[in-house]
Amino acid sequence: MNGFGVAAHARLRPDKVAIVHGDRRITYSELDDLVARAAVVLERYGIGPSSRLGVALRNRPEWFVGALGAARLGAACVPIPSGATTDEREYFCTDGEVGFLLDEAALPEFMRAVAAVDPVESPGPHRAPDYVALRAYTSGTTGRPKAVLRPETPVQQSIEGLVRYYVAYGLDSPDEINITGSPLHHLAGFSGPHSALLLGHTTVILDHFDADEWFGVVAAERATYAWCAPVHLYRLMSAADAVKAAADVSSIKRMLHGSAPCAPSLKREVMEFFPAGAVWETYGGTETMGTVITAEEWMQKPGSVGRAAPGSTIKIYDDDGGELPPGEVGLVYIGSDWGRGFRYAGDAELTESIYRGNLATLGDLGYLDDDGYLFVVDRRKDMVITGGANVYPAEVEAVLVTHPDVAEVAVIGLPDDEYGELVTAIVVPAGEGLTASELIAFAREHLVRYKAPRRVEFVTELPRDPMGKVRKRTLRAQFS
């Protein structure tokens, strides 16, 4: 997070609208004032250099007021789902060593304090040499989300990098308008608006993603670009014919999508609906970002996720660390010119295990063709990507197995037209009487909603290999 880009734009274009949220329009001058005041309040709350602010708010401007205020103090932002359960919040706050949690309950008092302070008191930048800007969480293979620490690159280097990306995307005007309906706690949700604010664009924040509302706001605000997961594209294309017929999307220059595989048939439908050349795809993860492919390129290389984005490098390695030639499948490694862009908190061994030099792997298998285009042939072995959000089965299994009527459980992802994959629990019951609805309700008491199973199947035993490991591939084939 960068709390000072807003200040620069407030000086250069004070009356430029920074954030639109419903009927609210906040200029850069107003946003800078709010962020400065928030920094004063947060400092009084004990937030300072190298400390951490947890943000568990719904989509609203105050999300950025708090996060950017913390950044001005040299503190890290810890995004937390606003719908997280008590158990999940406790984990995020304890593991993240959160000094103050800005959630919906704390927001009214916080904003009253912000309104009452003198922004002149706002502290200057106090950042440790190893300042960590963001402590985001990615689902962990051991059953608990893992903290990913993103250091703040020098401001000039950070902005130069963003400019390179956005020039490559064809979004090089200061008058660009971003629209987002993704949850701001998710990296894919806040990175678009945050980048927009760094570059002096306007960002339009929706409470949540609703296709009818999205079309209406795009037309009303003349939005020029959006970041979407395939589930959003599906919902847009599933809107009523009358809604789509009346939709004015002529202002859209780029529909950028990523975070999960997109069915070729859906992508072609989206490409036909939006202005020519508007649909571009990116590939990366919470940890890093690596490729981009234009609409024209994708038509020539269907199925590819693109070539290395400006400032990025892609290589394919075998299990022994040897670099593979074009056409050979291996582990995909990506990285940026800035060096290592992240590390796992408190786990140097895990961090080192995914790096080769400054390149990191997301655990995906793929190959480069002779022209340098990346094709991902398989994703992380067990991870479920549902609606663009990553869910690791181990975390869900750890909750479900605590139900007294569950003897064994395996969680897998099954194909779904809307969500991409459905979180599905394959259960060996401990007795009689357990129902799917009961188990789903139990899961939602302990997990944020998108992690809970949407489908439950009952079996008498789970298929296992000679070492006792569950054969999830067999289950996926059986229930798909």
Regions found by a protein language model. Name each.
Residues 156-177, 185-224, 239:
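Conserved AMP-binding/adenylation subdomain of ANL enzymes
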Residues 198, 224-228, 239-301, 313:
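Gly/Ser/Thr-rich phosphate-binding loop
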